[in-house]
C-alpha cells in the first residue's frame, strides 16, 4: 500500500546505506514463490480464483534483518505471519495441483525485500539489530498493509517487469 510505504521508507534508506545497496531500491515486496516458465494465460485465471475471497490485510515487521545470497536482497523479517502464510500455502498447493513448477517454497522465512545488493560483506550477513525506537515495555513495530498481489518477471538483465496485478477486496 502506498500510504504504508511512507512508514517503511526511512528504514529502507537506512538499510540501503548500511549494506551499500543500489540507490534505486524497489518498492518493498514479499516474495511468496517463484515459478519456472509459467504460462501466464493459464496462471492468471487460477490466481484470480484463489485470491477472490481474500481481503486487504496487515503484516507486522520485526527488527531482524537478513541478507539473501540467492536473491541478493536485504530483507526485513515479518512477525505473526499466519494470514499471509495461509494465502501462500493455498497459492502454492493449488499451483502444484495445476502442474506449475514452484522453485523456492520457503514458507517459514517470509520477509519484506527492501534493497538489492551486488556485494555482500560477510560480517553483515544475518545481522539482527534494533531498527525502531520503541518503549522497552511496550515494543510495537510498524505494520504494513498488503492491498494487492502481483506477478513479476525478472529477466537476465535483473530488470523487474510487472505482468499482472490482483487487488484485494476492502474490509
Residues covered by each model-derived region:
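Short hydrophobic/aromatic beta-strand or adjacent loop that forms the aromatic wall/cage
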Residues: 73, 111, 146
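Generic detection of short hydrophobic beta-strand segments and adjacent strand-loop junctions
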Residues: 76, 144, 166-168
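Generic preference for hydrophobic/aromatic residues in regular secondary structure cores
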Residues: 74, 151-153, 163
Amino acid at each position: 500500500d502506498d500510504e504504508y510505504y511512507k512508514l517503511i521508507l526511512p528504514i529502507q534508506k537506512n538499510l540501503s546505506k548500511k549494506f551499500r545497496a543500489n540507490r534505486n531500491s524497489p518498492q518493498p515486496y514479499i516474495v511468496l514463490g517463484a515459478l519456472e516458465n509459467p504460462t501466464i494465460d493459464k496462471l492468471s485465471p487460477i490466481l484470480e480464483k484463489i485470491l477472490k475471497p481474500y481481503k486487504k490485510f496487515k503484516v507486522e515487521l520485526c527488527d531482524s534483518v537478513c541478507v539473501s545470497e540467492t536473491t541478493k536482497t536485504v530483507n526485513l523479517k515479518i512477525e505473526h505471519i499466519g494470514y499471509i502464510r495461509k494465502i501462500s500455502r493455498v497459492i502454492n498447493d493449488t499451483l502444484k495441483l495445476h502442474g506449475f513448477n514452484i522453485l523456492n517454497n520457503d514458507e517459514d522465512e517470509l520477509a519484506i525485500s527492501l534493497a538489492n545488493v551486488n556485494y555482500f560483506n560477510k560480517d553483515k550477513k544475518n545481522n539482527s539489530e534494533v531498527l525502531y525506537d520503541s518503549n522497552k515495555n511496550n515494543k510495537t513495530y510498524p505494520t504494513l498493509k498488503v492491498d494487492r498481489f502481483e506477478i513479476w518477471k525478472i529477466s537476465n538483465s535483473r530488470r523487474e517487469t510487472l505482468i499482472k496485478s490482483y487487488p484485494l477486496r476492502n474490509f
